[in-house]
Regions:
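A conserved ligand/cofactor-binding region detector
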Residues: 1-304
């Protein structure tokens, strides 16, 4: 109930009239089944005041960013922005914690004095012998994190956005960051036509944006246009996300994004033990990545 309440209050603060309209429709239906949870949503001094709070923040931030310009000079696809320099030490401390009676501060002092060889031994023992990607290390891996800035096509973003154990934020969908050209388009020699259509859509986006605003203009942007977003997740989630999203049946674009994340964890962060233990991250390339998955799905449908 509270989740719906919060969602409706945020929807009521949205700049798009369509979103606010659906908020009212949802409220009407939800009050038929959980009325007691939604008493405050449209009270002037409660829910409506809360929605105004969200709306005021959005408007103020929109004004502020205009002071700094709105064009980006970088087109880097994946950038590792932030990570723990001493991630492996933190993870070792957390790995030992539940097996001892010592305080965390005492364990920190112990780990700081260990040789690199001993640290590696403890980490490998904690990670264990992973026989498949579902064998993920324990909660000590949640002690450290990575933060990435990503520029990818909107379709890939929508797939990666589905992961919940992370902090993810994104910018407005636009035509300002270019677009991707699917490999199949190049293979059938349709690239010129593709680019022509995308450029025309880009011009239409600008026309709509100047007339109705950028929030409305987002509706016409195809999934192949790029969007910028940030993803921050802990090391344990990195095992799950990167190994799952680089599987052979994944889409080539989000596979590439996740492969680059893994490379940056290894080479930029220098977390060699952690990166190498993500042994089900697949850096291979495949033709018709999803064909086997589609064949398997077709077989299942045929059996019904």
């Amino acid at each position: 109930g509270q989740a719906y309440e919060n969602m409706i209050m945020k929807m009521n603060s949205h700049p798009l009239a369509e979103v606010r309209s659906y908020s009212n429709l949802m409220l009407s239906e939800l009050r038929k089944v959980i009325p007691s949870f939604l008493k405050r949503v449209d009270l002037p001094d409660r829910g409506l005041l809360w929605s105004k709070y969200f709306s005021d923040i959005n408007q103020n931030m929109e004004k502020i960013v205009n002071d700094y310009g709105n064009n980006s000079s970088t087109n880097l696809e994946v950038d590792l922005i932030e990570w723990d320099q001493n991630a492996e030490d933190k993870i070792i401390v957390s790995a030992l914690y539940s097996y001892t009676n010592k305080s965390e501060r005492e364990l920190i002092k112990i780990v700081q004095k260990l040789s690199q060889k001993e640290k590696e031994r403890i980490l490998y023992k904690y990670i264990g012998d992973r026989n498949n990607r579902r064998h993920k290390p324990g909660r000590a891996m949640e002690r450290s994190y990575y933060r990435f800035d990503i520029l990818s096509d909107f379709g890939s973003f929508r797939d990666l956005q589905r992961h919940r154990m992370m902090t993810i934020d994104w910018q407005k969908l636009s035509t300002f960051n270019g677009f991707s050209i699917p490999q199949v388009i190049e293979e059938i020699n349709y690239q010129d036509t593709w680019e022509k259509i995308m450029i025309e859509i880009g011009e239409y986006f600008k026309t709509l944006g100047s007339k109705y605003g950028l929030h409305v203009a987002q509706y016409v942007v195809p999934f192949s246009y790029n969007i910028r977003y940030s993803m921050q997740f802990n090391v344990r989630e990195a095992y799950h996300l990167l190994e799952l999203r680089t599987a052979p049946q994944g889409h080539v674009d989000y596979r590439r994004v996740c492969q680059k994340m893994h490379e940056l964890i290894l080479n930029k962060a220098g977390h060699k033990i952690l990166a190498n233990s993500m042994k089900y991250v697949d850096h291979n390339t495949y033709d018709l990545e999803r064909i086997e998955a589609e064949r398997a799905a077709e077989k299942r449908r045929a059996k019904k």
